[in-house]
């Protein structure tokens, strides 16, 4: 850890098409090997697919992210010779990062034929509280609930 204090939060410019900082972060997380134009095509393609069914795609993406974002997670804490899984609250910036990561990972595992369709299907499912990303959040919450007895080890 840094001794000089916390690092400042990096700012992300809003995306050019929708003017949304959330969509810009989402594009950056979809990006692999620095190929931003490919990531933009994937995200905008997914939003076009969503737009066919729902006129306001940005609101649906935001709803999906809110549904997937975890409230608590477990962190390992070593006490004596034992390692405990201690439940801790998730701060807001990490909540969004985890939600985006889980949505993208779940979308990549789906069976649809193209990545924009996979991402669109996962976002639609997440907005309706179902799908792989929601399962991941539920699993995380279950782990925190099961280890609630160790909450006093919080740091």
Curated annotation (Swiss-Prot):
A GO-annotated cellular component: small ribosomal subunit
Q: In the record, which residues are listed under signal peptide?
A: none
Asked if the Swiss-Prot or TrEMBL record annotates the protein with the keyword Transcription, the reply is no
Q: Which GO terms describe its molecular function?
A: rRNA binding; structural constituent of ribosome; tRNA binding
- Alphabetically list the UniProt keywords: Ribonucleoprotein, Ribosomal protein, RNA-binding, rRNA-binding, tRNA-binding
PROSITE patterns assigned: RIBOSOMAL_S7
Keyword match tRNA-binding:
yes
Q: Please provide the Gene Ontology terms (biological process) for this protein.
A: translation
Q: Which family does it belong to?
A: Belongs to the universal ribosomal protein uS7 family.
Q: Entry's HAMAP family?
A: Ribosomal_uS7_B
Oligomer and partners:
Part of the 30S ribosomal subunit. Contacts proteins S9 and S11.
| Protein task | One of the primary rRNA binding proteins, it binds directly to 16S rRNA where it nucleates assembly of the head domain of the 30S subunit. Is located at the subunit interface close to the decoding center, probably blocks exit of the E-site tRNA.
Output this protein's name: Small ribosomal subunit protein uS7
Q: Identify the species of origin.
A: Xanthomonas oryzae pv. oryzae (strain KACC10331 / KXO85)
